């Protein structure tokens, strides 16, 4: 992986940007006002609901933040998160579905605001996400594999395109194609029969198509 070759992320990096105003953060059933300097407490918070914890790990909360300090807040929370969970590969933080979501959300953030942290370190960190997905693909046989495998493919495909890693994109694309045949019926409906998941998974495929 060459951290100097990232064709679609731009060159801006946030490095030492620090927030000066409070953050209102919303995490799947959990909301809190975070004061500048309290990011470590947020990252180490013991959540009652696992979905709130997963939302933190996935960085899916950042698009819903408002205010001029959003980028600075993501910068310091990212730094705190990496120090706390970057090497803790056995917990929820590195579950493959969550890894794919975090990779995609951080890439989206970088395209809007710049890379959190220092460029080479952050890109190297992002490159570790591919191996975490590859080594834990969520395939559990024809009858026990849900839609998570398609999301694994989405993470590899979009991450590969944005980071210039062709192998990721190739494998991710193949997973998406094969899973599309398996999880959708011939008339385009998700076999699970859930309208919620149908919209979610359809959005995944549309996102990959538009990015390609």
Residue ranges and their predicted role:
Residues 1-37:
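Extreme N-terminal leader/anchor segments
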Residues 10-14, 41-48:
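Short, well-ordered helical secondary-structure segments
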Residues 26-43, 55, 74-80:
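Short alpha-helical hairpin
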Residues 47-212:
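Aromatic-lined, polymer-binding surfaces characteristic
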